[in-house]
C-alpha cells in the first residue's frame, strides 16, 4: 500500500565561495538519522585532482562516496577539466539505472569555477560563485551572499562565518566546521 518507509538521512551543510582568485569549501560535521544525531565530526569534503579541486557532498553518505569516486574518475579521464568532468558525470547519472537511485548532491570548486551537481543529474553554475547544498544550504547561502557583497572577508572567512550562521539555525547542521582552500 503506500511507500516503503525509508530512514531519512540528513547529514550536512556544504558551502563553497570563490573570491579574488581563491576558493574555499567547507562543511559542518553532523550526521543524523531521523531525529537522532549519529556523529558530530563526519568529514564531507575532499581535495581532488592533485589538490586543484575541492568537492563536498550532501545526502546519503554511501551514495555520495560512490559519486565522488565516479567524479574523480571523470576528472582523471578529462585532464582535470572541471566542467567537462561534471557534465560527463551528470550524463552517467541520468542514464545509468544504478546511479539514478543515488540520493546525494555534490558541490565542487576550483580557483575559478563553482558547480553544483544535483541529485537529478543537473550541473548548475551559480552566477555569484557561491555553491551551497544540504539541509542548511539556504541559510549558509544567504549569509555568504551578504558577506560577499558587504564585507572584505576572504573566501575562507565567508565560508566559516556562513556555516556558523547555518549551524545556529538548522537543526541538521553543527559547528564542527572543516574548510579546505585553493
Swiss-Prot record:
Known function: Protease subunit of a proteasome-like degradation complex believed to be a general protein degrading machinery.
- Name of the protein in its database record: ATP-dependent protease subunit HslV
UniProt lists the family membership as follows: Belongs to the peptidase T1B family. HslV subfamily.
Active site at: 12
Task: Give the GO molecular function terms.
Answer: metal ion binding; threonine-type endopeptidase activity
Where would you say this protein principally sits, based on its record?
A: cytoplasm
Cellular localisation: Cytoplasm
EC number(s) per UniProt? 3.4.25.2
Positions of Na(+) binding? 167, 170, 173
State the GO CC annotations. HslUV protease complex; proteasome core complex
Presence of the UniProt keyword NAD in the record = no
**In its UniProt record, which GO terms are filed under biological process?**
proteolysis involved in protein catabolic process
Q: How is its activity regulated?
A: Allosterically activated by HslU binding.
The coding gene here is hslV
Q: Which reaction does it catalyse?
A: ATP-dependent cleavage of peptide bonds with broad specificity
What are the record keywords, sorted? Allosteric enzyme, Cytoplasm, Hydrolase, Metal-binding, Protease, Sodium, Threonine protease
Amino acid at each position: 500500500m503506500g511507500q516503503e518507509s525509508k530512514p531519512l538521512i540528513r547529514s550536512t551543510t556544504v558551502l563553497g565561495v570563490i573570491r579574488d582568485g581563491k576558493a574555499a569549501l567547507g562543511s559542518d560535521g553532523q550526521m543524523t538519522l531521523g531525529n537522532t544525531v549519529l556523529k558530530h565530526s563526519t568529514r564531507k569534503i575532499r581535495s581532488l585532482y592533485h589538490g586543484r579541486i575541492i568537492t563536498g557532498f550532501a545526502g546519503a553518505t554511501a551514495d555520495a562516496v560512490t559519486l565522488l569516486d565516479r567524479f574523480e574518475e571523470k576528472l582523471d579521464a578529462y585532464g582535470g577539466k572541471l566542467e567537462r568532468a561534471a557534465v560527463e558525470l551528470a550524463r552517467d547519472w541520468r542514464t545509468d539505472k544504478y546511479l539514478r537511485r543515488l540520493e546525494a548532491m555534490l558541490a565542487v570548486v576550483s580557483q575559478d569555477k563553482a558547480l553544483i551537481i544535483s541529485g537529478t543529474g543537473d550541473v548548475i553554475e551559480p552566477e555569484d560563485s557561491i555553491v551551497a547544498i544540504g539541509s542548511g544550504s539556504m541559510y549558509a547561502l544567504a549569509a555568504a551572499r551578504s558577506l560577499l557583497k558587504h564585507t572584505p572577508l576572504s573566501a575562507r572567512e565567508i565560508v566559516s562565518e556562513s556555516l556558523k550562521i547555518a549551524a545556529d539555525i538548522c537543526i541538521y547542521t553543527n559547528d564542527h566546521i572543516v574548510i579546505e582552500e585553493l
